[in-house]
Amino acid sequence: MRILLMTDWMTPIRDALNTALPDHDIVTAEPEKLSDAIAQANVLIPARNPITTVELQQGTNLQLIQQFGAGVDAVDLESAAAMGIPVANVPSGPSDLAKAVAEFALFHMIGAGRRFATLQQALAKQSVQTPFGASVFEARVCIIGVGGVGSALARLLQAFDCD
C-alpha cells in the first residue's frame, strides 16, 4: 500500500510510519509533484492541504483519506463520499489529541498575555524591570465550544482560577 504524506514537514512521522509499517510504501512529495503522487497513492494524509474534487479525481487508486488531526473541513466530504472514498480523522478523546491542543492553546494564552517575544528579548539583554503583560491567573476566559479541546482547556484553566 502506498501512503502519501502530503507535506514535507512530516519527515519524523514518515520515518515512524516506515518503522511501524515496513510492508507499506510511505512517501512525501514536493508541491510540484503532488498530482503524480496522488495518482499513485492508496491513502492520503493531507495535513493542511485542501482535498478538493480535483485531487480526488487524480487519486484513481485512493482507498482512504486519513486526516492528521480532528478536523476534516479541508476535505470535500461530498465528493469523497460520491467516489466511495472514506475519510477518517484522529478523534480528540481516545488519542489525547484534545489535551495536546488544549495545552498548546494555554501556552499561547500565557505567551500572548505576557508578550513572550518582547519578554524574551528583554531577558536576553538582562533588562527586565517590571512584570510583562497580563497574567492568566483569575482571568475571565471565553472558550468557544466545549468539545474535546474546549473541555480540556477548561480543566487546565481551573488551576489558574479563571472565570
For each of these PLM feature ranges, what is it?
Residues 39, 80-82, 159:
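Residues at the C-terminal ends
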Residues 1-41, 161:
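N-terminal glycine-/charge-rich "phosphate-binding" loop or analogous flexible N-terminal tail
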Residues 130-163:
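Rossmann-like dinucleotide/phosphate-binding beta-alpha-beta segment
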Residues 34, 52-55, 132:
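Acidic, amphipathic alpha-helical patches
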Residues 24-30, 45-47, 121-129:
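Short gly/ser/thr-rich secondary-structure transition/capping motifs
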Residues 37-38, 56-59, 136:
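A short, aliphatic-rich alpha-helical micro-motif
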Residues 43-120:
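Phosphate/diphosphate ligand-binding glycine-rich loop within oxidoreductases
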